[in-house]
């Protein structure tokens, strides 16, 4: 939101809807109504979704494509977690749906999440349409940032050409870590993980804990930091739908994860 508003644009939020099983889905009717009401010309798509961890199915993306194409909306597809779908799921790049979809899509990827290269600040912007590509290059030129750093380029190429073994091992580690956290959360009253299909992040619903402890959603981050000693991501930074949620990164050594879970369990027991 901050980046959009700094660029003097207006955010037209369309919250995801959580079903009875805790799975997040898009409200396409609400999306279309918002596009018609606001005249929005660009949609930011997170695929897989951060923070809720959905790996959108081809059918879901095709339905989204119908709406955006009908209204001439450009889709900026943030697919930085595309490599990190969990076993049983696979990321479908939005632009791969069809040539028509690719024509109004700007795809953003990077080796930073998959290969732990965020510090090198390198990413890939894929634009099939010539007009969109010219527009992007023109805007890029106005920033004065026209060339990525040499080390980042070298690392990016090495990761994509020679990083298969690393990525396979990472995916196994993340899947095991996620299952481990979900099992441990069964011992912690009032906190549960939303069903997750990808990324190395878990979206934790803490509403039960807050209710039991008599706390307000805005106090959650304070409890996590001061009582549990954990610096997690307050769900509110992701919008109103994040109230009562927090985000945790499971891509770390098992000992680190276990210590964090111990501190979380201890703090919840003490507060409630």
Regions found by a protein language model. Give the residues of each.
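PLP-dependent class I/II
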Residues: 1-272
């Amino acid at each position: 939101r901050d980046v959009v508003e700094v660029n003097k644009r207006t955010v037209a939020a369309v919250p995801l809807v959580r079903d009875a099983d805790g799975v997040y889905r898009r409200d396409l009717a609400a999306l279309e109504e918002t596009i018609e009401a606001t005249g929005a010309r660009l949609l930011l798509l997170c695929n897989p979704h951060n923070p809720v961890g959905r790996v959108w199915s081809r059918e879901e993306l095709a339905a989204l494509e119908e709406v955006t194409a009908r209204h001439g909306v450009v889709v900026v597809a943030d697919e930085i977690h595309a490599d990190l779908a969990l076993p049983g799921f696979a990321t479908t790049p939005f632009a791969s749906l069809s040539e028509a979809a690719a024509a109004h899509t700007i795809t953003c990827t990077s080796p930073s999440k998959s290969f732990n290269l965020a510090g090198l600040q390198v990413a890939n912007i894929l634009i099939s349409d010539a007009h969109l590509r010219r527009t992007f290059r023109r805007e890029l030129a106005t920033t004065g940032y026209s060339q990525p750093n040499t080390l980042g380029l070298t690392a990016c190429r090495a990761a994509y050409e020679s990083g298969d073994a690393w990525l396979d091992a990472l995916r196994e580690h993340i899947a095991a870590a996620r299952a481990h956290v979900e099992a441990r959360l069964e011992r912690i009253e009032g906190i549960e993980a939303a069903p997750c299909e990808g990324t190395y992040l878990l979206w934790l619903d803490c509403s039960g804990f807050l209710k039991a402890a008599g706390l307000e959603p805005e106090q959650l981050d304070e409890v996590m930091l001061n009582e549990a000693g954990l610096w997690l991501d307050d769900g509110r930074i992701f919008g109103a739908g994040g109230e009562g949620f927090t985000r945790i990164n499971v891509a770390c050594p098992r000992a680190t994860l276990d210590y964090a879970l111990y501190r979380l369990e201890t703090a919840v027991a003490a507060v409630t």
